Regions:
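Conserved polymerase palm-domain catalytic core
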Residues: 47-136, 140-169
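Active-site-proximal segment of RNA-dependent polymerases
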Residues: 5-57
Length: 169
């Protein structure tokens, strides 16, 4: 984004999105600000699954591009802003009706917007007594049972239900 737009996006990130950090799923390991009390990164993501016998990893195709204007609008609306403010915030944070790569707001918005998908995966993980985490666009489930694990169909069903596509390459 242009430098003036980027400055405004940083303001939105620091003054709106970071104040809603508690709404990010505890299973989201990517795009988290550094915090000595709650360190979440690619290493902590891998550690969650290190002792598991099996592991399933699914990459979401075109992650930011898949998060549309309407989802961003809905997120800001839920924060209680008036419609005009929601419109402006959404326009500041999207480009061509999607979350743009490289915008300071996109990573945190993605974490906040996909909370319902994270919750659905936590439910699936609980059902199969396994571990779930998401690092940015990478979904990981792991466990120790030799016979019980979620099927790819179960996983894809959640991905598709939240308007994403798995990268099957």
């Amino acid at each position: 984004p242009y430098s003036d737009l980027k400055r405004v996006q940083r303001w939105v990130y620091e003054n709106i999105l970071l104040k809603d950090l508690s709404s990010v799923s505890p299973c989201a390991e990517g795009f988290m600000p550094k915090d000595k009390d709650d360190i979440r990164n690619i290493v902590t993501n891998a550690r969650r699954h290190a002792r598991s016998k099996w592991l399933i990893n699914v990459d979401i195709q075109d992650f930011f591009d898949s998060i549309k204007y309407d989802s961003v609008w809905e997120y800001f609306s839920k924060l209680g802003y008036e419609e005009e403010v929601v419109d402006v915030l959404t326009k500041i944070c999207t480009y061509q009706f999607r979350l743009p790569q490289g915008a300071p707001t996109s990573p945190m918005l993605s974490n906040l917007i996909v909370r319902s998908m994270d919750d659905a995966f936590v439910e699936l993980a609980d059902k199969f007594n396994c571990i779930y985490s998401r690092y940015a666009d990478d979904i990981t489930l792991s466990g120790n049972s030799d016979s019980i694990m979620p099927s790819m169909r179960d996983i894809y069903q959640i991905v598709y239900a939240h308007h994403f596509r798995p990268n099957k390459k």
